[in-house]
Amino acid sequence: MARKDMLTGKSALSGNSRSHALNATKRKWNLNLQKVKVMDENGNVFTIKVSARTLRTLKKQNVVVA
């Protein structure tokens, strides 16, 4: 499975790592993905991968199952 937030669709960012001499090498900034269980309106429980930022929002909306 891709390193992608299943709700927002966010994925890793790419860019350059810069040394002191400003040499550029490619690198990625990965998301802080967490597996959480969420409940829909019908009471069904699903396990999804979301970023830490999305997890904060879900907890605020009381969607996350403990």
UniProtKB/Swiss-Prot annotation:
Gene3D superfamilies: Ribosomal protein L28/L24. GO terms for biological process: translation. Pfam families: Ribosomal_L28. Residues 11-22 have a biased composition (Polar residues). Keywords: Ribonucleoprotein, Ribosomal protein. GO terms for molecular function: structural constituent of ribosome. Residues 1-25 are annotated as: Disordered. The keyword Ribosomal protein applies. Belongs to the bacterial ribosomal protein bL28 family. It comes from the Bacteria. One of its GO terms (cellular component) is ribosome. InterPro entries: Bacterial_rp_bL28, Ribosomal_bL28, Ribosomal_bL28/bL31-like_sf, Ribosomal_bL28_bact-type, Ribosomal_bL28_sf. This is Large ribosomal subunit protein bL28. The keyword Acyltransferase does not apply. The gene is rpmB.
